[in-house]
Amino acid sequence: MLQKLMEGSSRGYVSLDDLNERALAKNDPELFLQLHKPPVLIDEVQYAPELFTYIKVYADTHHEPGAFWLTGSQVFKLMHGVQESLAGRVAVLSMTSLSQSEINGAGTEPFRVDLDALLKREEKALPADTNGIFERIYRGSMPAIASEKNTNSQIFYSSYLSTYIERDVKELSDAIDALKFLRFMTAVAARCSQMLNVSEIAQDADINQKQAKDWLHILETLGIVFYLHPYSNNLLKRLVKTPKLYFYDTGLVCYLTKWSSAEVLECGAMNGAILENYVVSEIAKTYLNTGREPFLYYYRDKDAKEIDIVLEQDGVLNPIEIKKTSNPGTELTKVFSLLDKASVPRGKGAIVCMKPKVGVVDRDNYVVPIWVI
């Protein structure tokens, strides 16, 4: 992607996958930077942390924003070097798997609960019926899948997990057993879109709770999972405090939980949970993949009344419900009034569902097809 953005510019490119370049960067970083003058993109920079001190000196003396684009596939190593040497001198952009709008070439505008914005998204998006939505969910959104370089998603995810566990996870701790970690990931995937229950995950994975917490942190840091925290406000009482867990890529969830096809998934016991995961992750990615923070929460009180998503934006709270139905009624929006006691005013609401076109439930709530997000 960055190489595409570089086209037509004077920016150079070097990858430290090249062992000769890597050796030079490690043994003589000053000479390396003389040969690869900024502006430059240095890929897999985590292999030569010796560069960071020299990049820091350059940044302090030249004040050229964007002089160095640094990328890496091993997050822990990369971020350790950045935090140690480049704190305050670097902007960090975490790249998740692709959003559906990116895959379709429909633009990169973040999702907003605004009628004009929704109609514009509808014009650019690629329509899909229920079968088509579950095909997207099952196939996943990894770049290699989206670009059709790998037509068999099951083979891709098998290889992806082997590489991921052997390289990124084992790098953090040689003591991590690969088979146990895979069983742990399967236990986590089986609980996507649920309130986090570390005890149950640990029990299913046959590990202790401390291990489960540590391994969840690994999954979060490596950009595999994320959490929606419950919306909290001093004026709202009796709210739960446990976050809900989601995966950025539903194709990985489907592989881990062993669904054999999109058709079987659509009728299966996890169809609602994985559909919710898909919608939440897609909305989050429309923000994250443009370098913006998504202020997404969920609402649940001690009476088990719940709103799937609460989007805080532009001074209002937008409640969002996710349903598999293609004919949503006004009864689905009644729960939105639970936010009326919050100190932040309630804005427009949305039912994200299988309806074929953007529409309205009433003056304050919209119907949004899942393919539009």
For every predicted segment, state its role:
Residues S10-P39:
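Short glycine-rich substrate-engagement loop in P-loop NTPases that contacts/grips substrate
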Residues Q100-S101, G105-S281, L288, P294:
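Interdomain hinge/linker elements that couple catalytic modules in large macromolecular machines
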Residues T71-V75, G81, R89, T96-L98, ...:
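A short beta-strand-to-loop transition that corresponds to the Sensor-1 phosphate-sensing loop
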Residues N20-R22, Y47-P49, K77-L78, I145, ...:
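Catalytic P-loop NTPase motifs of RecA-like helicase/translocase cores
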Residues M1-L16, H36, H217, G223-V225, ...:
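A cross-kingdom feature that marks ATP-driven nucleic-acid transaction machinery
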Residues F76-V92, N104-E109:
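Short regulatory helix/loop adjacent to the ATP-binding pocket of P-loop NTPases
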